[in-house]
């Protein structure tokens, strides 16, 4: 019983120390994120993460529907026999880009490091180029045009992450 009483102040001091350490880390993180360039890097990484994770997860959970639609979409193209492989490739690439961008957003907020966000932005840019190519081959010019803002965002993200 006496040992427990003497350990109590030590436990309280340890708890205070860890609480202060967490508060310092949060303060540092907020100070980082309040810088305009860091905030823009964080926000674009988060945007790319949401965009590509949602798109990739939609393809995973609605694979059969997407495959059916894309099979018709590419039926009159040289890629008509590769639709399933293309869908799997794009799905994996989108999920990976989204995960890297999400890890990058966390990394930017926590330490200011840009590595994961850069890899995510670069892969996202390549994904958009692949989608654009597919839309052009399928002669879906409106669909291809709708990808241009995403391409601009992804390239801007890559450039922003070099600052």
Language model segments and positions:
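Short hydrophobic transmembrane-like helices used for membrane targeting/insertion
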Residues: 1-2, 12, 26
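Intrinsically disordered, low-complexity regions enriched in Ser/Pro/Gly/Gln/His and often acidic
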Residues: 3-4, 62, 112
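N-terminal amphipathic/hydrophobic targeting modules at extreme N-termini
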Residues: 5-19
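Proline-rich intrinsically disordered, low-complexity coils
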Residues: 9, 20-21, 36, 78
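Residues at secondary-structure transition points
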Residues: 13-17, 62, 104
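Extended, low-polarity transmembrane helix blocks
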Residues: 21, 27-58, 88, 92-163
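Solvent-exposed, well-ordered loop and adjacent helix/strand elements within mature globular domains
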Residues: 50-91
């Amino acid at each position: 019983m006496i040992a427990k009483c003497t350990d109590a102040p030590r436990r309280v001091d340890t708890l205070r120390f860890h609480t202060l350490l967490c508060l310092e880390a949060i303060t540092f993180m907020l100070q980082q994120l309040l810088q305009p360039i860091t905030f823009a890097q964080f926000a674009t990484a988060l945007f790319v993460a949401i965009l590509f994770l949602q798109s990739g997860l939609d393809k995973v959970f609605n694979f059969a529907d997407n495959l059916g639609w894309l099979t018709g979409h590419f039926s009159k193209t040289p890629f008509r026999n590769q639709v399933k492989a293309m869908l799997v490739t794009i799905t994996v690439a989108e999920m990976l880009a989204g995960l890297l961008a999400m890890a990058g957003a966390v990394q930017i907020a926590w330490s200011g490091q840009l590595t994961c966000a850069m890899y995510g932005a670069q892969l996202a840019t390549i994904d958009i180029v692949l989608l654009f190519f597919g839309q052009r081959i399928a002669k879906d010019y409106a669909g291809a045009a709708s990808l241009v803002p995403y391409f601009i965002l992804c390239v801007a993200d890559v450039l922003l992450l070099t600052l």
